[in-house]
Amino acid sequence: MSKVLVLKTTAQADEVSNSVALTNRFLEEYKKFNPDDEIIIVDLNKDEVGTSILTSETFPTFYQQEVTKKYINLLKSVDKLVIACPMYNFSTPVTLKSFIDHVSVANETFSYKYSKKGDAIGLITNLKAQILGVQGAPLGWYPWGQHTQYVEGAMRFLGIEFNKTVLLAGVKVAPLLELTPAQRVETIIDEVIQAAKTF
């Protein structure tokens, strides 16, 4: 049995959120292959880890906060991580960026201490992660808007390995624009099922 941490990051209400629809459908399929796994869902909008941002005022104590320790320990205690990752203005939601800031702590989640080449060594080596990405534009319209690649890179820096990202792209243009979030997810259901099977 595995423990699975699921991060909800959307600023939208659940009923209109494409990333919530994608995450729910993924978990539905995942449970078919892993019925005994424990699923822990955290809504970053409702937790300090997603709303306490790094600024000049918070920087002096940012990495000493209890919430930082709590989520580093949580990452070390689970086996799998699911990241719901919608695109907002070509980037991730601020809640997800804040989470990444909180858990990226030298000598806790990464280290340069034993590096032979000067690059970082990730210390969160117990985890496999799955990104469930959503974006309004079709893939390739805005090459600089690679929000899922940023998240994957930041998490790999910490030592986390990844299943192939699932991306629901083009939700703000026809033909997907005319569909409900759940219907949009069904257009990539084969990818969702494959990801659930291999995760």
From Swiss-Prot:
EC top class named in words: oxidoreductase
Reaction(s) the record says it catalyses: 2 a quinone + NADH + H(+) = 2 a 1,4-benzosemiquinone + NAD(+); N,N-dimethyl-1,4-phenylenediamine + anthranilate + 2 NAD(+) = 2-(4-dimethylaminophenyl)diazenylbenzoate + 2 NADH + 2 H(+)
Coiled-coil zones: none
Protein EC: 1.6.5.-, 1.7.1.17
Keywords: Flavoprotein, FMN, NAD, Oxidoreductase
Binding-site positions, FMN: 17-19, 87-90
Pfam families per UniProt: Flavodoxin_2
Gene Ontology MF terms in the entry: electron transfer activity; FMN binding; oxidoreductase activity, acting on NAD(P)H as acceptor; oxidoreductase activity, acting on NAD(P)H, quinone or similar compound as acceptor
Cofactor: FMN
Protein's job: Quinone reductase that provides resistance to thiol-specific stress caused by electrophilic quinones. Also exhibits azoreductase activity. Catalyzes the reductive cleavage of the azo bond in aromatic azo compounds to the corresponding amines.
NCBIfam families named in the record: PRK01355.1
Quaternary data: Homodimer.
Protein name: FMN-dependent NADH:quinone oxidoreductase
Organism: Mycoplasma capricolum subsp. capricolum (strain California kid / ATCC 27343 / NCTC 10154)
